């Protein structure tokens, strides 16, 4: 029986029971001692694939831990689940859909049927449509209402229509096509639109309205604001089609807005928003870095797809990272996971991974509707590593919670300045080393005595200088952030999330919690604006509505 129809109670499986016992045996495990006694530890717990090098040796694991986690993956049927996803089975059971974002990066000639129809010709037709548009804009052939070429592209979208494309276009700025600047408009806060409008000219700006339904509130409101601004700047309704295109499955609504049908790029219901940067949602990426680099991005992701499908679990990067997350979340009570990129251009990867992980695995029922028997997705947080060292790394080192971390660092900088990059790389390694090693009481005391401090002061200050250590982390190293390697990196995290959903028996491809807030937002808006005098369902919400109505001006 398919895993998504009858998910296992993972806590009843033999491997889970064995992991419980193993966890007790690991209570006093010391990574410091493990490295001191096993010269092969680094080589045993490292691997490379698709241009990524993973060091997971700084984890609270032994080879037995890895074997037990791999056994757990086998017992929940992970191999069959991976095949089910790639074959287009209805792994998104609550919506009755497949989850086939991986199809978007498959090469020409592959075949994949959904409801009996091969979808691959459509996938490559849209890629060709994107290639044509990008070429026309980059060659200066797509012109605005004053016949000037396009210089600015504004992507209007939110969630997956924004976070992934923004991450990639900023991470690959070294590959940017000169002459076209890309901007993102997501928030419904008018200040964001105001600031953007100060940077662009209507006559040379192309807006991409990215919304599957063409009815997403924030996106539609921003599109309407952009349309009104364009008209106020001298644009006309007749020439609107030169300045607005859409990525949507609702052609009728896009056409009614003023977008020509040939400038509407399709979306499929088998691609979820947070997995959609590989589709026409990635148009701003292609416009930023060129279509050949966009295809390199797809190629890197496809290489990771192949690794995920074929590598044995004990040598499978996404599988191991997913299993380590289960190990810490379910057996060590870790509640969050830090993503720490040591690269300025990767500064937005944490935001993308927050949505990818938390929207996918923030679930409390299994695929069959029964409650989960374990904790599920952690809080994902973090930020640029060097900056974080002077902010929240303190909590990682001396806080009371265990917070596993992923360090991500390139070997080569696109913009070398003196020895800055050597220091950046050194800081990345030293942070993971410090988390693992810590500082003992004896070491703290010896350090203070060396400074000539009297014994009373030593004993007073030493407890504050103790760093527990034994804090787990992974280090992901790439030679440099290229389209191909970035594609592999993002795809790796997609697969990691899927692995964990299979272990927990949850659906990684729906997001009903998001829908509830949207529906309630409409009702609150009606009460705020006087559309209804009906009271809110609770006194707090009604009180805040009244507070707003009594003070709002404008």
From Swiss-Prot:
Catalytic function, reaction form: alpha-D-glucose 6-phosphate = beta-D-fructose 6-phosphate
Highest taxon of source: Bacteria
Catalytic residues in the record: 359 (proton donor), 390, 518
Localisation per UniProt entry: Cytoplasm
UniProt keywords, alphabetically: Cytoplasm, Gluconeogenesis, Glycolysis, Isomerase
CDD domains membership: SIS_PGI_1 (cd05015), SIS_PGI_2 (cd05016)
Gene Ontology biological process terms in this record: gluconeogenesis; glucose 6-phosphate metabolic process; glycolytic process
PROSITE patterns: P_GLUCOSE_ISOMERASE_1 (PS00765), P_GLUCOSE_ISOMERASE_2 (PS00174), P_GLUCOSE_ISOMERASE_3 (PS51463)
Protein purpose: Catalyzes the reversible isomerization of glucose-6-phosphate to fructose-6-phosphate.
Protein name: Glucose-6-phosphate isomerase
Lineage of producing organism: Bacteria, Pseudomonadati, Pseudomonadota, Gammaproteobacteria, Pseudomonadales
